[in-house]
Amino acid sequence: MTRRHVVVMLTTSYPRFPGDTIGTFMEPIAKGLAARGHAVHVVLPWHPRLARGPVEDGVHFHPFRYAPHPDLNVFGYAASLRADTHLRGAAYMAAPLALAASWRAVRRVAAAVGATLLHGHWIIPSGAVVAAAAGHLPVVVSLHGSDVYVAERHALARLAAQAAARRLDWLTACSDDLRDRMIALGADADRAVTIPYGVDARRFRPDAVLRAEGRRAIGAGPDELVLFTAGRFVRKKGFEYLIDAIGRLAPRWPALRLVIGGGGDLDAELRARTGERGVADRVSFPGVLAQDAVAAHLAGADIAVMPSVHDDAGNVDGLPNTVMEALASATPLVATRVGGIPSVIEHDRTGWLVGERDAHALETAIEALLADPGARARLGSAARADVLGRRTWDAVAEAFEQVYDRAAGRAERRRQTD
């Protein structure tokens, strides 16, 4: 029988309002734990667009302010890094203020609600903060991607991550890659576990009505073949390689179209690249899509593609949300063999995996599926079945629940020996 935990989560990203695309995986983790009977309190930075009530679906929200000037509201919500590779100048000024404010907020909320456990999302900065604020409370830290990258490349961040790793009771990662990299930095392998993200299989589903809605939104005719991808326009998404692949495919597939949902620092560059490759009329950019719109676009697509890469600085996605959403939608998926992607895709059964930074490999895989509707149906059906069997958000919440119990048990043993 699991314990009932009073959890204070510290995070730098969370959907700021219903339908927001920032930190989308955080909401189902928090809501899933609350639905299983735990008291969940989320401490998060204030943001001008933050529109959360005090309690929603059993999750309590505690925003903290840190910026004396609006220009310094760059802590969290994917605002600290430029193209996910370099810290913005304002982030250097905001970070000390935000770290101090988040530490005070965690201590205040934990005392007020009688916390039994602290959970930091991203080891830098939240993991380091909860480790410093915990006292005797058990600490769980979750790795999501850019945190490990920052720790690997910046000495002060590395020292903070290593200090947090020594203090925490249990570590989770959304991919084996992140877990192994943090172990290489000093985390205890015996207290580190991989918990891949889940997906809302009710929202993301194969459905004729949803497919028709998506095709209308795309403006696709009945005979057109649609590829879909989505994400922030940053280097590690690898969208430029997909555009190059479309440039190669377009002459042979006149009915082929590509839709790239999202936005970000590379918007103008990606649009320009479509012109350079002669496919500006084949590639559309609908902007940042709400979750329901992503579901419709995936249902309306013939193939989903996630061309993630290690960027030039070495940063890589932990596990892109679009991968899980495509699998649940039964949309056949071509993805690169990087980060956490291989941990959720079995090649030639639930999707196709190719090497990164390889437009020719993307071209070959996409063309093979375009030419074989039977293979597309087979991959999509197997992917959907795999999601329903073990990759729902409830399964993820149960896995975190088990980690909480282990962390609490270890903290009790530690207190007995202190």
Question: Can you say where each PLM-predicted feature lies in the sequence?
Answer:
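Conserved donor-binding/catalytic core segment of Leloir-type glycosyltransferases
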Residues: 221-237, 243-246
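Acidic donor-binding loop of glycosyltransferase active sites
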Residues: 282, 299-316, 331
